[in-house]
Amino acid sequence: MLTTLNSPEGAVFYFEKGVYGYTCKNLDVPESATTLTFIDESHTYSGSGYLLKNVMKQFPNIKTIVINAGVQSIEIYNSMFPNIEKVISYSRNFKSGPMLISKETGILLNSFYHDKDFVIDMENIELVRSYAFEGCLSEHIKNIPEQIIAQGNSFAGSALEFGRKQFVNGVFLIGKTVVGVDRTADMAVIPDDATGVYIKNADDIEEVVFSNPDQLNKLKGTSFNTLVINNRLNLSVNDLLDYLSDIYAKAYRIAKNSDRFCTVDGVVYTKDKKVLIKYPNRRDGHYDVPEGTEYILYNAFAGSKIESVKFPESLFRIGTYAFSDCRQLTDIKFNHTIDDYSRFGDMGQFYGCRGLKELEIPSWIKVLSSMMFSCCNLKKVVLHEGLEIIGDTTFNDIAADTLTVPRTLKTVKANNFGRFIKELHVYDRAPEGILLSVLNAYNDTSTYNKIGLTFKLIVTEDDKDYTFYFPKTLPKEVISQLDECFRMFSPKAADIDWIDSLYALCFSNALVQDTAFELYDITKKDIYRNALKRSRQSIVKRYFNEGKEEKLVKFFQLGFFAKSSLEKFLKLAHENNMNALAAYILTEIEKKAPKNASKKLQL
């Protein structure tokens, strides 16, 4: 509910009622007003809040803001009131003065557009909000605290950001807190004793140098060109990777005197260059992992922009989630050394690489790890002879409708290949778990149109193909029986009568009927035709209710209805504006009419 209230100056505030009270999300101010009062409970609503950062309006004539006692929060950009000179607060939540400051929490919310002679008093300020200094022309600061927290872009668009006199070695310090960098400099050096570092974007600077690795914890989400760590780094590999995670760089450089780590072309390695620790995640293009590399650490490439990669023969291990969420990765050149990607308990090496459209697993790879290619965007997978085990959820959904598996494949663990596979080709015996993966055991009617109703299995034995059709969706215990049947026995021993009867085990009458219809269309077997004939009245009624004209035409082609029934359905077709169906029924009625009939039905 929207409620409007007026300030003493004639401004109109538009309040919305929420769970925690009333919030103003828009306002109009008369041009004649030079003062604006943020109203409170004396104007009905207690605990008023003002969330106005999404309001694209400007009120240049306002020079004074008055805050009444019950106002709880104010969120505005400096640009809304570009000529503010002072704030008068009767609220315990805000200070009076030239800037908007939260009294209890010490948060500087807005400095406003003060001129270059204005002195910014930072006494008791503990945190500076994002864009608090936008448009402020002053570079004069006093009472600077040793420690302060600056949210992202706190000084963006201000003289403090662009002025040069505040910068020392390319960084802008407030007390011992780095709150900005000189974007015109080639290098910014972060002081060792800086107690806080708040930089959101350093793209314009070629190098940002750190000597204290603990400061890197403050840089999650920050972008760099080259991040230089000028420290010997007596850290564990895991600690270093943790420091570098979620920092976006095009290259890293570690001090040459480090006994533990080094960088090769901007990539972080152990000193002996055997373990690849971190690839710069803003670097795109192709990467040849250097010969001599033995282990790619977990998460080493995670989230990077790499597009293709080639592995050396020296590499014997790729860690868990090493390339996870590399969404631009489209090509992988596997080496011949690794034949079991789960050997060390690793998994998910290429999880979420949605750029992968096609994948060919070479013949020397025997085992694929769990989730290795899960949540990718694969449309085609080629599995060569030699592959023996596919781990749990290795391929959780492939947007392909056919799949051929090699003779050597023995085990397919749960949740593989997914619902879209409609045709499977195996040799001699089906691998354990394959049918449990490709058939659907969930009664989810919204997916039937996507996954289809029937499934085709081709088993090649002694150069002869045996083809079986059964429902795509079945109870899990039935799928387990099918999986065991084709895993344990020759296709010649399959119980065809039992397989043909499985349609009746689908989850609903509608699914039973539609599956029988589709299976009859494929096989022309009497078991399906007889089932359709028994249910013909309910099928036609349902198809009319669902508006499925095309299916109705196809169903009437089975010839289950006499002339009298067809005449009733002709009327229904007209009533439902199903012209194609009406034309077909009329033709069938005419065929059934006596040859000497002189009168024909008219469409």
What are these regions (language model features)?
Residues 1-73, 80-127, 134-152, 157-174, ...:
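Structural signature of tandem-repeat unit edges
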